[in-house]
A protein has these predicted regions:
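Glycine- and acidic-residue-biased ligand/ion/polar-headgroup-sensing regions
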Residues: 48-65
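A short, N-terminal "cap"/entry segment at the start of jelly-roll beta-barrel domains
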Residues: 1-31, 42, 74-78, 119-133
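Compact, glycine-rich, soluble single-domain proteins
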Residues: 40, 63-65, 71
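Short acidic-glycine-tyrosine-enriched beta hairpin
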Residues: 67-87
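Conserved short histidine dyad/triad with adjacent acidic residue
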Residues: 31-47
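Ligand-binding loop in jelly-roll beta-barrel domains
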Residues: 78-79, 87-113
Length: 133
Protein backbone atom coordinates (compact mmCIF):
# COMPACT_ATOMS: atom_id res chain seq x y z
CA UNK A 1 0.00 0.00 0.00
CA UNK A 2 1.46 3.35 -1.02
CA UNK A 3 -0.57 5.27 1.55
CA UNK A 4 -3.87 5.01 3.38
CA UNK A 5 -7.22 6.24 2.10
CA UNK A 6 -10.40 5.49 4.01
CA UNK A 7 -13.33 6.64 6.08
CA UNK A 8 -11.51 7.45 9.33
CA UNK A 9 -14.75 8.10 11.20
CA UNK A 10 -16.17 4.68 10.26
CA UNK A 11 -12.82 2.97 10.96
CA UNK A 12 -12.71 4.58 14.40
CA UNK A 13 -16.33 3.95 15.37
CA UNK A 14 -16.19 0.28 14.29
CA UNK A 15 -12.96 -0.42 16.18
CA UNK A 16 -13.46 -2.67 19.20
CA UNK A 17 -9.84 -2.91 20.36
CA UNK A 18 -7.89 -0.85 22.85
CA UNK A 19 -5.43 0.02 20.07
CA UNK A 20 -4.99 -1.00 16.44
CA UNK A 21 -2.35 0.38 14.09
CA UNK A 22 -4.13 1.18 10.82
CA UNK A 23 -1.19 2.56 8.84
CA UNK A 24 2.51 3.15 9.37
CA UNK A 25 4.54 5.40 7.08
CA UNK A 26 8.11 6.57 7.37
CA UNK A 27 7.19 9.68 9.39
CA UNK A 28 3.57 9.17 10.52
CA UNK A 29 1.44 6.43 12.06
CA UNK A 30 -2.36 6.17 12.33
CA UNK A 31 -3.99 4.21 15.16
CA UNK A 32 -7.59 3.78 16.30
CA UNK A 33 -8.52 3.24 19.95
CA UNK A 34 -11.54 2.38 22.06
CA UNK A 35 -11.64 3.06 25.81
CA UNK A 36 -14.23 1.54 28.13
CA UNK A 37 -15.99 3.78 30.71
CA UNK A 38 -13.44 4.75 33.37
CA UNK A 39 -10.52 3.40 31.32
CA UNK A 40 -7.57 5.59 30.38
CA UNK A 41 -4.77 5.50 27.86
CA UNK A 42 -2.39 5.56 30.81
CA UNK A 43 -0.05 8.37 31.78
CA UNK A 44 2.76 8.40 29.24
CA UNK A 45 5.32 10.52 27.45
CA UNK A 46 6.73 10.20 23.95
CA UNK A 47 10.25 11.57 23.59
CA UNK A 48 10.81 12.79 20.05
CA UNK A 49 7.23 12.00 18.96
CA UNK A 50 4.37 14.46 18.51
CA UNK A 51 0.86 13.03 18.90
CA UNK A 52 -2.50 14.18 17.54
CA UNK A 53 -5.69 12.74 19.09
CA UNK A 54 -9.26 13.19 17.83
CA UNK A 55 -12.34 12.04 19.68
CA UNK A 56 -15.01 10.67 17.34
CA UNK A 57 -17.47 9.59 20.03
CA UNK A 58 -17.66 9.87 23.80
CA UNK A 59 -16.38 12.18 26.49
CA UNK A 60 -13.14 12.32 28.38
CA UNK A 61 -10.59 14.25 30.36
CA UNK A 62 -7.17 15.09 28.96
CA UNK A 63 -4.35 15.68 31.45
CA UNK A 64 -1.10 17.33 30.36
CA UNK A 65 2.00 17.84 32.47
CA UNK A 66 5.68 18.74 32.43
CA UNK A 67 6.61 15.70 34.53
CA UNK A 68 5.24 12.26 35.35
CA UNK A 69 3.98 13.47 38.73
CA UNK A 70 2.52 16.80 37.61
CA UNK A 71 -0.77 17.67 35.92
CA UNK A 72 -0.43 21.24 34.67
CA UNK A 73 -3.55 21.31 32.49
CA UNK A 74 -6.86 19.44 32.47
CA UNK A 75 -9.33 19.67 29.57
CA UNK A 76 -12.75 18.09 29.04
CA UNK A 77 -13.19 16.70 25.51
CA UNK A 78 -16.04 15.13 23.57
CA UNK A 79 -17.15 14.33 20.00
CA UNK A 80 -15.05 16.08 17.36
CA UNK A 81 -12.48 17.54 19.81
CA UNK A 82 -8.80 17.32 18.95
CA UNK A 83 -5.68 17.37 21.12
CA UNK A 84 -2.06 17.91 20.09
CA UNK A 85 0.55 16.58 22.50
CA UNK A 86 4.07 17.83 21.71
CA UNK A 87 7.01 15.49 22.19
CA UNK A 88 8.15 15.32 25.80
CA UNK A 89 4.78 16.26 27.38
CA UNK A 90 3.29 13.78 29.86
CA UNK A 91 -0.34 13.06 29.05
CA UNK A 92 -3.35 10.87 29.69
CA UNK A 93 -6.88 10.59 28.32
CA UNK A 94 -9.55 9.17 30.62
CA UNK A 95 -13.00 8.06 29.46
CA UNK A 96 -15.40 9.97 31.74
CA UNK A 97 -18.58 8.90 29.93
CA UNK A 98 -21.01 6.00 30.23
CA UNK A 99 -20.16 4.53 26.82
CA UNK A 100 -17.03 3.73 24.87
CA UNK A 101 -14.67 6.57 23.97
CA UNK A 102 -13.70 6.20 20.31
CA UNK A 103 -10.67 8.07 19.02
CA UNK A 104 -7.91 8.01 16.49
CA UNK A 105 -4.33 9.11 16.92
CA UNK A 106 -1.51 10.20 14.64
CA UNK A 107 2.08 9.79 15.79
CA UNK A 108 4.96 11.60 14.07
CA UNK A 109 7.23 9.68 13.76
CA UNK A 110 5.63 6.23 14.36
CA UNK A 111 5.40 4.93 17.94
CA UNK A 112 4.22 1.32 17.65
CA UNK A 113 5.41 -1.62 15.53
CA UNK A 114 3.55 -1.82 12.23
CA UNK A 115 0.56 -4.16 12.41
CA UNK A 116 0.17 -3.82 16.19
CA UNK A 117 -3.22 -4.84 17.61
CA UNK A 118 -3.82 -4.67 21.36
CA UNK A 119 -7.24 -6.09 22.19
CA UNK A 120 -7.09 -4.72 25.75
CA UNK A 121 -5.15 -2.16 27.78
CA UNK A 122 -3.57 -5.00 29.77
CA UNK A 123 -2.28 -6.52 26.54
CA UNK A 124 -0.87 -3.14 25.47
CA UNK A 125 0.87 -2.64 28.82
CA UNK A 126 2.39 -6.14 28.70
CA UNK A 127 3.71 -5.53 25.17
CA UNK A 128 5.21 -2.17 26.14
CA UNK A 129 6.84 -3.68 29.22
CA UNK A 130 8.35 -6.46 27.11
CA UNK A 131 9.78 -3.84 24.71
CA UNK A 132 11.44 -2.06 27.65
CA UNK A 133 13.21 -5.23 28.83
Amino acid sequence: MLGWVGDIEQETLENGTFRTVVFTGEQTQLTVMSLEPGESIGREVHEGIDQFLRVERGSGRVELGRSEDTVDETHEVSDDWAVIVPAGVWHDLVNTGDGELKLYSLYSPPEHPDGTVHETKAEAEAAEQAEDE
